[in-house]
Amino acid sequence: DFEELHRFSNNPRLHDGHERWNVGELLDGLTTGLAKISNGGRDVISIGVDTWGVDYGLLDGRKRLIEDPICYRDNRTDGIVEHVQQLISRDELFRITGLQTLPLNTIYQLVAQREAREWPPSAAHLLMMPDIVHHYLCGELVGEHTMASTTQLASATTREWAPEVFECLGLPFEVM
């Protein structure tokens, strides 16, 4: 049997010209839920994290989130697919990643951020949304494979990041 102990909203907000996820609010909701479990005398054996794909956050060298992640619903990727296809064909990208082209995919968000010159100079790590939660819970920087597969930056055959895609698009491989 399952019992819902806590529920909280997750709504993007407009900040600095972009729709952003409020990570602090999300983590507060998570913390409240975990406290309710603990206060209820339940034994916690493990915790699973399940979120949507494609969105990411950038962390600095001290492993702190630089700014709230931009939501996949933001319009910053308008026209980016066509720009990327001038650098790497849709067929070649599919051959490498096995993922369909959608403007909300992480690859297009990263190119849009770079093209808009909004890449923070202090960015040292990139974490997908569930990995931000993992980092909050345990302090580790981990890129979980199934979430990485939503980025259109991972090889479908090796299950590793595809450095040739990063190089072709001028994206910083070292933050992965």
Residue ranges and their predicted role:
Residues 1-68, 79, 95, 122-124, ...:
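N-terminal glycine/serine-rich phosphate-binding loop of ATP-dependent small-molecule kinases
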Residues 4-7, 50-54, 80-86, 104-106, ...:
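Short hydrophobic/aromatic-rich motifs at helix boundaries and adjacent loops
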Residues 93-176:
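Gly/Ser/Thr-rich active-site cleft segment
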